[in-house]
Amino acid sequence: FLKDQGYAVNESYLESNLQKLLARYRGEGWYNDAPAYDYYSAWAYQTYGPIWAEMFGKKQYPQYARQFMENQHDMVDNYPFLFSRDGRMNMWGRSICYRFAVTAPLSLYEYDKSGNVNYGWMRRIASSTLLQFLERPEFLEDGVPTMGFYGPFAPAVQIYSCRGSVYWCGKAFLSLLLPENSNYWSATENNGPWEKELEKGKVYNKFQPATNLLITNYPNCGGSEMRSWCHETVAKDWQKFRSTENYNKLAYHTEFPWMADGKNGEISMNYGTKNKKGEWEVLRLYTFKSFENGIYRRDAVLETDSCVKYQLADIPLPDG
């Protein structure tokens, strides 16, 4: 902004920061959140990057702007598939109280001139994710979005969050900056590939080799599922969220928002082992091995006892 207004800026420092941001890009539309993958790729990198490129970068730093826009284009073929057939978002990763901020990059596909974007599907996802929360009375408390997902939910809140953090939700309304006759606003809402391409009785996997992320779509129930990265010990998790349910589940499903694990073995979407202390300990130290023939393989080891090892093979099924 300052350079655009004619002020002198530290060029080398500015460019070094741009290079650091782009160095976080791993492929297929995903930036790494150091060390995990989560929605920061979408509501931060894939939101700020295209906006910066469009408003400033294309004129002042075209080579960097081009990279941000190419990275945005890579996202088209997988990120929208993370949402359910009805357009609901998945409860996955940190800062989930930002909720429908996950839709921020969808309207910014307006900057994508490839002709490969289904703008009606993008807006369908955005409007449905808004309704996913606005139609629930527990979403608001004293007129302010609660700290949680559908309602207040402490296990999903991080140490850096406060009551004002929820206003990141407002990023969803960046779409209002687009003109009324834009592709995003003029297209008719639709369900994209859920309408005809994703057939019932089948399961559809989108594996991304650059990140080892697996997005699975289930036409029978209309749900979508994410398998992602987690390899963080509780002992060294100074941030107190990298090793938790926000990341350590075997998978995250749009139809089954995760629940907090209980001390008496109440565990969802994970395996629990009673450790030497007599405590139920879930898996969190996963190592990706392969994805072949529809089988997603990981090894896992118990944090408190490295002799306890698992070889995991996930086979997504139409009703499983």
Give the label of every model feature segment.
Residues 1-191:
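Extracellular polysaccharide-recognition and catalytic grooves
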